[in-house]
Amino acid sequence: MSSTLNRLIGLCLCAAVALPSAAVFGASSAETHDLVVYGSSPAALTAAISAQRLGKSVVIVCPETRIGGLTTGGLGQTDIGNKSAFGGLARQFYRDVAAHYRAPDSWKWQKRADYLPDGQCAGTHGDESMWTFEPSAALRILERWEKEYGLKIVRGEYLDRAKGGVSVADGRIVSFRTLSGRVFRGKMFVDATYEGDLLAAAGVSYAVGRESNATYGETLSGTQVANARHHNFVDGVDPYVVKGDKASGL
């Protein structure tokens, strides 16, 4: 009887020691960074690079193995009229595209001289840039950025959207867990997915589609049928707080 009791006491003592140790291990196993970026879109990479330039520790966590989102997944046409609106790393990307296609061996299917010298692929005056590209070229550029900037990208990690998968305190994301069990903590988080997966899992409210005019007391939300061609505003839109008064500010 006494030997059995001794065994039970011993097991209880072991459990009492082991449980706190397990809790401490779980906390210490979390990876902590100044900035945690979820997603692998171009926005994810540029956010990470910008933060690293400021001396911050950064990790990109993404479910994909192929980084770059739509840019490397098939959307190789940049549909924008005013290209001078681009700057920073976005502009650098298009300059890198131009540099890629200056190499003769980049042209496998046709000659460079035969490929749209004007139109959407033309750069702005005095700037070496190219605005259409193959997704494989975009992938090559972004993977080179990954190496050049020393980005830490954790691929193949899906956000655990079950209860407790995202830890929030005082309205701020503290950490999130992936389906593999890894935990990522950060001082700041960036949701660089296209669908807003991290923010939705954190409890941020969202709407699917377009709100009606009544939701926020607006007049131009919802589905508009008037002036539908090109979706342009009618003439006469005034940008100032007080109509016609520049001094009132925008």
Across the structure, where does each feature detected by a protein language model lie?
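Conserved N-terminal/central alpha/beta ligand/cofactor-binding core
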Residues: 56, 62-167, 207, 215-217, ...
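Conserved beta-strand-loop-beta-strand element in the redox core of flavoprotein oxidoreductases
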Residues: 164-183
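Rossmann-like dinucleotide-binding core of oxidoreductases
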Residues: 198-250
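Beta1/beta-strand and adjacent pyrophosphate-binding region of the FAD-binding site
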Residues: 30-41
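Bacterial N-terminal signal peptides
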Residues: 8-22
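N-terminal Rossmann-fold NAD(P) dinucleotide-binding loop
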Residues: 44
